């Protein structure tokens, strides 16, 4: 299935992404962006504004959880070592300034999006996703956080808890 840029979201993000613009030019100053920073920022903003369904987001999360193997098509779409790298990045920066609290409370590596989506990864087990506005002060969906937190709790998916998940018990 295809994905498209949500024009309204793209325009909204473009009108308010002053911090990202500053970061792009700072990266250019330190030779970490090798081309036009405004062009790089526009590309980044467009990819942040792509519309997907909850199912598409969950399949993407599961692909990360299964080290690059899409669970629907069974195709390998990226190198296996990238799954761990991506999940680690999600665990450390996926919720912006709320990342530490989120990870402590849920134990779920996750990434939020400005459209109200959140995708979470339980390495080797599953991917999960939820969509729901409104966003909190850090730009994270309030209701999607509650939904994923509930799922993690009910299924014992916290990656820091040594007990088995009920999913593992059913296998």
Predicted regions mapped to residue ranges:
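Solvent-exposed, flexible loop/coil residues
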Residues: 7-10, 27, 45-49, 56, ...
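Glycine-rich, acidic and aromatic/proline-enriched surface loops and short helix-turn segments
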Residues: 25-32, 63-66, 92-95
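Conserved active-site and cofactor/substrate-binding residues in soluble primary-metabolism enzymes
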Residues: 18, 22, 35, 39, ...
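Structured C-terminal helix/loop/strand segments within mature extracytoplasmic catalytic/sensor domains
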Residues: 66-171
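Surface-exposed loop/turn and secondary-structure junction residues enriched for glycine/proline
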Residues: 30, 36, 44-48, 53-55, ...
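Active-site-adjacent helix/loop patches that line small-molecule binding or acyl-intermediate pockets
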Residues: 1-47
């Amino acid at each position: 299935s295809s994905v498209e840029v949500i024009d309204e979201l793209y325009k909204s993000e473009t009108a308010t992404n002053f911090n990202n613009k500053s970061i792009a030019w700072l990266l250019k100053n330190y030779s970490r962006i090798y081309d036009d920073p405004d062009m790089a920022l526009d590309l980044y903003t467009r990819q942040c504004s792509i519309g997907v369904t909850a199912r598409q987001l969950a399949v993407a999360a599961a692909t990360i959880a299964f080290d690059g193997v899409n669970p629907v098509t069974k195709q390998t779409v990226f190198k296996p070592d990238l799954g761990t790298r991506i999940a680690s990045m999600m665990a450390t920066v996926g919720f912006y300034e709320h990342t530490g609290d989120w990870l402590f409370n849920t134990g779920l590596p996750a990434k939020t999006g400005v459209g109200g989506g959140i995708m979470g990864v339980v390495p080797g087990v599953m991917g999960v996703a939820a969509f729901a506005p409104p966003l909190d002060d850090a730009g994270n969906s309030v209701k999607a956080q509650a939904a994923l937190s509930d799922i993690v709790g009910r299924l014992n998916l916290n990656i820091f808890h040594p007990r088995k998940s009920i999913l593992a018990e059913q296998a």
